[in-house]
């Protein structure tokens, strides 16, 4: 290394903003990758439709939480740059608005110019009133009179009746009317499009096609029926998004459950952060009024050619897949886990060896069976579990309730602060309490995000402890859609760690000394930093330093700085980060040995895996935590090692195959841009998610033979 290069390297300030991606803009880049899936012609048509809905749903939450938070900072006069890319809240809002308008316009074009015409080719059509037959018009008028009209409530806006407080994410019609009998000025009324009614209406059609019309179009057409004696001058559809981040004051709350219930009611009425309208249909005077009443800036107005709120496409997808299965992905059935083939009793199987689970390729059912069996087993004394997000009719909740009714000691930490699942979790908490479960409502100032279950069993005068640790939620619905990993073990020291973990959550004990676990908000960041430091030392000695880390998001600056340090030392680093990534790879003398990949495919990549070559003595860890500051400091998380060699080999193979993906993988360049990984003509196509399903199916089939 020359003197000049040495000087260049030592002079580099790793805090330079150019070495980082802004968190919010990086998230928008992720949502752009979601939109790319709607554009990708290799995806079946109805799957592309669903990705448009996912893009919209993601964006709603982004505005309700992230944009709303930045706006609150600006209102409070906070102008300090964030600690990575160095952007102030105002600068972030400006760049978010600019990029978002581009992406929303692209989504709008994809829907109106690509997806809708392609649906029409398959006999799926969305019609306007001009395109309806007389029979269809007659059908809709009856439908309106009998089913829609009774649900509608026109809300006049005048000196005595102020502008109504409109619900978050509600679709509304601003109706300008004029009295037929007088020369009085025009008046305004608001009609909310009822969310209790289906957004699309199937029309009678004699040629076998599936023809639909949107609910707001029907209401607009017959709207004069709501305003007898008035002429309707204009109908302007619009939608507002509000601040929905809950400011929970935990320190002063005597009852956290009641405090959250109280704040949930306010969520519907937060400050407006976005206004969406349909191009060509918005009355200019109405727009001016909306901007004034909602206190919204013009930069926060989004004008679309197509319909507002494409999240209705989720329901349309579910309606169409019955008749158009050929336009969807092939159904993939989760297989029996490799480690449980031939086993009949879950506890006997775990006593033989650690059980590794790879969802959704391997079924989530063994996790449900683990808890359900424990609930009925007379030898089980206690069950303890953390719950962050669960499904609507959760078999796990039912099993826990049954266990308590069977006289077992059941303790469940239900995280009431799981964003947008608060209401659901409150209901489950109440149900569990009624069944006799001891429910803990989270920890003050922290979210319990760890995924852990402890079953204590009495057998042959001995106490056995069985532990499940995972990267994903105890949610049987999302377990079919998210990629996650889990471990079932009867290792005595893991059992002791699990016992101490739950005692720490439920009581007043100091942080325990762990045998194997690392936890947040305590030592988890230090553990990661130490592991990277060890890899740097191994590389200096052996020249083969290698780190592979897979996660949802990477934002934590101390970890990014340590990764830059490792890269500068020559350690090869491969990161698989689905969402936000504030680290920039490939920067000379900073991150030139780091590569960053993102996979967006039919399943949501959710597993957190950490591999360190460690001079040939491979170290593998799984975790509930991403490399995000909130996971390090504001959540209760668990990092756990994998010791069983066969499981280690499987996880390393999974990481290797993921890095070979040349169908759905994108790679980030040094400027923060993502591009599809290019496949050479000589290379075999690798779509890692399908490869994992093939592997699970082949193993299951071979064992069955």
UniProtKB/Swiss-Prot annotation:
Binding site for ATP: 58, 482, 578, 606
Keyword field contains ATP-binding: yes
Gene Ontology process terms (BP): polyphosphate biosynthetic process
The protein's Enzyme Commission number: 2.7.4.1
TM ranges: none
Record field: catalytic activity: [phosphate](n) + ATP = [phosphate](n+1) + ADP
Post-translational modification: An intermediate of this reaction is the autophosphorylated ppk in which a phosphate is covalently linked to a histidine residue through a N-P bond.
Protein origin, superkingdom: Bacteria
Signal peptide span: none
Keyword Phosphoprotein (UniProt): yes
Binding annotation for Mg(2+): 389, 419
Alphabetic keyword roster: ATP-binding, Kinase, Magnesium, Metal-binding, Nucleotide-binding, Phosphoprotein, Transferase
Molecular function via GO: ATP binding; metal ion binding; polyphosphate kinase activity
Family to which the UniProt record says this protein belongs: Belongs to the polyphosphate kinase 1 (PPK1) family.
Protein name, entry field: Polyphosphate kinase
